[in-house]
């Protein structure tokens, strides 16, 4: 790109500072739906006891999500998004824009990094559940055939599927793996009642093999390795809908 066009360094001369902010995918998708150069939300920066607090509020007219993964849906996106501020870490990061005539312009130098996270709410929990359900759906779909299948299959003493199923039951201590979405629903339901669980209790609740259950837990939860809740599991911050309590070190 630089070989074909000119490079405008006005931003460097003006020493323009910019923020590099990571936002959730659904938020960027909602911004893209805004008409023209309309307002997408409000950014608030406040000082509390010498500490900078930043948050973004999405406009109400952009909060409605009508599709998830290309499938029709009806859910409201979280509107409140507090920022988690991060240092640049000694790096020199810059932001460029490119015009239709291949002209590059330096817009500014990154002076602050941040992550825009949704506040814990029922809307966010419902959105995450729909996203998990959509991602868990099988890619392969059944198809109706136009012609009658004439291939003859000979009867067998036992089908391969049943053999594999019985083998897995023995290997997993007679616990057969349930559908992933069903296990997720059981886990979310359990964590709505209590914030912390040890693995043994979750195995008793879900009736799932330990290895399989831990694979799913690692997607939505974290294991505490210290403090008064050592060796227990709790939901990751993005899946919680309760106020986090203080942890002991």
Swiss-Prot record:
GO BP annotations listed: positive regulation of transcription by RNA polymerase II; transcription by RNA polymerase II; transcription elongation by RNA polymerase II; transcription initiation at RNA polymerase II promoter
Residues where DNA binds: 227, 229
Quaternary data: Heterodimer of an alpha and a beta subunit. Interacts with HTATSF1 and GPBP1. Interacts with URI1. Interacts with GTF2B (via N-terminus); this interaction is inhibited in presence of GTF2F1.
The name this protein goes by in its record: General transcription factor IIF subunit 2
Residue positions, PTM N6-acetyllysine: 22, 33, 137
GO cellular component, one term: microtubule cytoskeleton
Organism: Homo sapiens
Modified residues (Phosphoserine): 142, 248
């Amino acid at each position: 790109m630089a070989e074909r066009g000119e490079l405008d360094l006005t931003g460097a001369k003006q020493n323009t500072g910019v923020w590099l902010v990571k936002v959730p995918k659904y938020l960027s998708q909602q911004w893209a739906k805004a008409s023209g150069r309309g307002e997408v939300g409000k950014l608030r920066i406040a000082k509390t006891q010498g500490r900078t607090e930043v948050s973004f509020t999405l406009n109400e007219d952009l909060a409605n999500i009508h599709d998830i993964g290309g499938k029709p849906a009806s859910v409201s996106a979280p509107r409140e998004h507090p920022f988690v501020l991060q240092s640049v870490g000694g790096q020199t990061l810059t932001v460029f824009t490119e015009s239709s005539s291949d002209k590059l312009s330096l817009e500014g130098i990154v002076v602050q990094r941040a992550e825009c996270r949704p506040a814990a709410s029922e809307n966010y929990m419902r959105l995450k559940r729909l996203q998990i359900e959509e991602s868990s759906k099988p890619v392969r779909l059944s198809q109706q055939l136009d012609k009658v299948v004439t291939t003859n299959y000979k009867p067998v003493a036992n089908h391969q599927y049943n053999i594999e199923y019985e083998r897995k039951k023995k290997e997993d201590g007679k616990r057969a793996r349930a559908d992933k979405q069903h296990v997720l629903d059981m886990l979310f339901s359990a964590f709505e009642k209590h914030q912390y669980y040890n693995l043994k209790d979750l195995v008793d609740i879900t009736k799932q093999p330990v290895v399989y259950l831990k694979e799913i837990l690692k997607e939505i939860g974290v294991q505490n390795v210290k403090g008064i809740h050592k060796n227990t599991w709790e939901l990751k911050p993005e899946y919680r809908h309760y106020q986090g309590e203080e942890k002991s070190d």
